[in-house]
């Protein structure tokens, strides 16, 4: 049986670490999220970050990756157009990230009106023009 966690794509070291933290956090908290605690013991998770040859780096996708893993383990889709960002620690603390302005603009361009941002980035968001 092939199981574990595999990352592919042009990911920088910080993003790889962020993905590994998200995976470790979710495995440690499966019960808290109402998931089968053996789910990842029986599964191979392959996370591929596309976008051509453009390298990706930074901690901003930690919360998003953890959310995707919980969604997978619960066998429940995230039902609405949604954008999110935030760093994540092994204890589940959500960390602020940079580039809030650019991320909000990208979400709006994609017609995504619901965003989840770290609380610590609230001021960055409030300072944006409408």
Residue ranges of predicted features:
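Peripheral, non-AAA+ core regions of ATP-driven protein-machinery
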Residues: 1-130
């Amino acid at each position: 049986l092939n199981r574990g966690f595999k990352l592919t794509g042009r990911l920088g070291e910080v993003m790889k670490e962020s993905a590994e933290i998200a995976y470790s956090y979710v495995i440690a908290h499966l019960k808290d999220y109402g998931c089968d605690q053996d789910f990842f013991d029986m599964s191979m998770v392959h996370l591929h970050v596309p976008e051509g040859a453009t390298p990706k780096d930074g901690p901003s996708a930690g919360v998003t990756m953890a959310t995707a893993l919980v969604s997978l383990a619960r066998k429940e889709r995230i039902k609405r157009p949604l954008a999110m960002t935030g760093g994540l620690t092994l204890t589940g603390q959500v960390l602020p990230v940079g580039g809030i302005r650019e991320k909000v603009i990208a979400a709006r361009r994609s017609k995504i009106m619901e965003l989840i941002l770290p609380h610590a980035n609230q001021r960055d968001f409030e300072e944006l023009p409408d």
